[in-house]
Amino acid sequence: MAKAIPKKGSRGRISSRKSIRKIPKGVIHIQASFNNTIVTVTDVRGRVVSWSSAGTCGFQGTRRGTPFAAQTAAANAIRAVVDQGMQRAEVMIKGPGLGRDAALRAIRRSGILLTFVRDVTPMPHNGCRPPKKRRV
């Protein structure tokens, strides 16, 4: 019977595998739909540092689309990167949801200096036909 070959470096790790990087500047993406708000913090190259959404903060159902849920999600996403030394950030807001302003307010309150805020909501130049209106 073949013996199991021990893996190199499997005898207990002294430090964590992922080294904590110092990130002085980053990009905060806010995606606000009517049902949920997702906040993603990346470095300047686009690598995700931390993220949070209203769903991961414990809100369920229609409460995920509320401004308070968006505020909580933004605060959770930013708490991790402030510990890594982020001081300046750019903000990209996408979507028509209620959480746009609340998430931006939470970011401003966190103490990170915002270099600019840009609305990157995709707008059609009369592209596809929209779905038919609901009849209630």
Curated annotation (Swiss-Prot):
Query: Which Pfam families did the record assign?
Result: Ribosomal_S11
Q: What is its main location?
A: plastid
Q: Which Gene3D superfamilies match?
A: Ribosomal protein S11 (3.30.420.80)
Per the record, GO CC terms?
chloroplast; ribonucleoprotein complex; ribosome
Which keywords has UniProt assigned to this entry? Answer: Chloroplast, Plastid, Ribonucleoprotein, Ribosomal protein, RNA-binding, rRNA-binding
Q: How does it assemble?
A: Part of the 30S ribosomal subunit.
HAMAP family hit by this protein = Ribosomal_uS11
Q: What is this protein called?
A: Small ribosomal subunit protein uS11c
Phylogenetic classification of the source organism: Eukaryota, Viridiplantae, Streptophyta, Embryophyta, Tracheophyta
